[in-house]
Every structure is written in C-alpha cells, then in structure tokens.
Amino acid sequence: MALASGPALRALAGSGRLGLGGYGTPKRGAYEWGVRSTRKPEPRPLDRVYEIPGLEPITYEGKKHFVPWLARPIFPPWERGWNDPRFHRAAPIHEQTLYKEEPCYIFHQRCRLLEGMKQALWLTKTKLIEGLPKKVLSLVDDPANHIENQEQRVLDIISHARLWHSTEDIPKRETYCPLIVDSLIQLCKSQILKHPSLARRTSAQNCTLATTWNRESLLLQVRGTSSTILSAKDPLPVIASREEVEATRSHVLETFYPISPTIDLQECHVYEVKDDTGFQEGYPYPHPHTLYFLEKANLRPQRFLPEQLRAKMLLFAFANALAQARLLYGNTAKVLEQPIVVQSVGTDGRVFQFLVLQLNTTDLASSEGVKNLVWTDSDQLLYRHFWCRPVIKKKVVVEPVGPVDFQPETFRKFLALYLHGVV
C-alpha cells in the first residue's frame, strides 16, 4: 500500500469535520444542491422614524456620518439648478399642461382590437361591403392595364426578396416583407409612360397622423406614424353614388355587448385634441391615396391576426380621410357633398389585405343617419409557400427552390388599386 503525502493525509483527516462520513464532501443546505430560487432577495427595510407630537427625532445629520443608534435624517430633494436631460423627471400627470379630466381612448400602431373588424366598424360608424368596388374590379379584368411579362416579373420580385437579396439561408420576415412591397410599388410605377398622370403622385414614410372625434359619449383618437403612404395632387373619385350613400341610413351597426367598445384602446388623460394630416400647409401632394401596412414581425406572438390587421387598416384610413375632410370642409359635423376615398393595403409578404374606404359623413356622435362605406377583399395569397432550399428525396428533387402556388390575380388587384384614379 502506497503511503500518502502529508497534504493528502491532512485532507483525509479533516474531511470528517465536513460531514457525510468524512469523505470530503462539503455540507450544504438542501436548496443549495438543487435548483436555486430565482426570487430576488427582500429589500432592506427602511428605518422607521417615529413622529411623536411635541418631540423632535434625534438624527445623525449633524454628525456627517452614519450612527446606528440615531434616526436617519430626511433631506430635501436636491436641485441641480439646470435641466439635465439624462435625469429628467416629468411632472405628475394632474399637473401637466395637457391634462384633462375627460379620458381619451387612443388607437396607435401596436393596438390590437379584441373584436377586430366588428369593433373598428362601430368606432368609425362604417358599413362593411365584402369584395372590392366594381370600378376597381374593372381595372383588374382589363388586359390593357397589365404590364408586359407581368407574371414573370412578379416571380422575380418574390425570388429577389426571399432568395437573392439576403446572404442568409432563410431570410427573416422583417427583411423580405418591406422589399416585396417596395419592389411591387416600383413595378407599378413603370406604367408611368403609359399613364403620365402617375407623375402627379409621390410616396412618403413615417408620416405622423392625429385625428380626434366623438363617438356617442366617448372621445376617440387615432395617433401614430404610417409606414408608407401614397399621396396625390388629385383626390380619388367617388365610388358610391348619392343614392347608395342615402341608403346607408337604414343600416344598423352591429354591437358586441357586454364587451366595451373601447377595449384594447389606450386610456389617456394627457392628450391634445388636434387634426394633423402629417403634411405642412402648401404640400403639393395633399390628398391621401393608398396606405401600406407591413406585418413584418418575425415571432408569431408579435404578429397581428388578419382580422386585427384589417381593423388597423380601417382605422388609419378613416383617420386620414377625416383629417383631410376637416382640412377641406371645416370642423362642422355634416354629410359631405364630396365624399373622400382612401385605400389601404396590408401584407406580411405573402398574404394581402385590400381595403377601400369612402368617408361620407363627419357626424359620428350618433349611430343614426348616413354611414361611411368600406370595401374589403381579405386573405389574398400571392403565393402559398417559398422553398429557400430544394426538397430532395431519394436523390430526386421533389420541390425546387422558388414559390409554390403563385397567384397572379393578387398582384392584378394590387396594380388596380395603384392605377385607380388614373385609368
């Protein structure tokens, strides 16, 4: 038997004091061996200063150092004497200049309406019509409006966004979704030689918008930025005739009692009642034409459902139309002699939502009278799936790289909405 060295003998002899039979295993608590708690330690309790009437607590303020048996002094808040933006402290809500007793329910870009389109229709006093207007569908079916080699060019746009543009094996949605929409808009702009009136339009991004209106006893506001807006020098032509507008008086708006119509809207007491189209006075392209909404979140829980996306499209299109109507006709609530038409397109890079809104009235307080009109064409697939890598089984290419089930009809509707007002 080999003799152990001095340090080894001392380690074996001293292991008995560690517990567990002297085998050198350290003795620890049960929770230290298992999964430890993730709860943060309790904060240190604040020193209580007993305020006894007629007696002044004895503190260590004059000592200039901590004394454990004396009370902690209470110092007044320190003022720098100048405003440091790194340590800005906002005033209490009730002391701010824009504070109001009446709450305002605000809809912004990240609001997801629980009831979706049904809730948006009630908030905007709008009647829903399934399908696109006949005037737009006539542009879809007219071969004269098609682009030369149209289908192949759209396929190239899809492949460029999802395969050629990025160095990643499988590009993310936030990469290919804006690229597909921008490329499709650029393809539509190529018709400017055939339709010179397209030169009277321009697109802008991140335009601020704010519109406020009363709906029954509620004060509502749409506020935020739009991703891309196509504006023009001339407004879109009216879609529904005067007889169709008057026929909306008999339409009854669907309610969703007992759910509150303001559910999922942000309740706020600090707000400003204003109408802002996002453009300064004298802007040469003042009339909104089409709004483009991109649902480019990579994670599924962060994406809008199609119903919620259509509701957001309706509310922002309505807000743009209402702000434009008040700019042209004033703030008086009335039925518009010349209704305002605004279009909207929403997509996640694969599924498209189309919407056309006609604002007929700015009298939104009551549910009676003339209603606004909206036409929707929902869940239009541009393609069903895109293979970034070929599917090979038994050394045979089963699915080649590229889109699956391409639907050219979807781009025709996209192009028809772009050409609406010119053709």
From Swiss-Prot:
MF-aspect GO terms: structural constituent of ribosome
Oligomer status and interactors: Component of the mitochondrial ribosome large subunit (39S) which comprises a 16S rRNA and about 50 distinct proteins.
One Gene Ontology term from the biological process aspect of the record: mitochondrial translation
Presequence range in chain numbering: 1-29
Family the entry assigns: Belongs to the mitochondrion-specific ribosomal protein mL37 family.
InterPro entries in the cross-refs: mtLSU_mL37 (IPR052482), Ribosomal_mL37/mL65 (IPR010793)
Domain of life: Eukaryota
Keyword annotations: Mitochondrion, Ribonucleoprotein, Ribosomal protein, Transit peptide
GO CC annotations, alphabetized: mitochondrial inner membrane; mitochondrial large ribosomal subunit; mitochondrial ribosome; mitochondrion
Organism: Mus musculus (Mouse)
A Pfam match: PDCD9
Keyword Cytoplasm in record: no
Keyword Nucleotide-binding annotated: no
Location in or out of the cell: Mitochondrion
Name of the featured protein: Large ribosomal subunit protein mL37
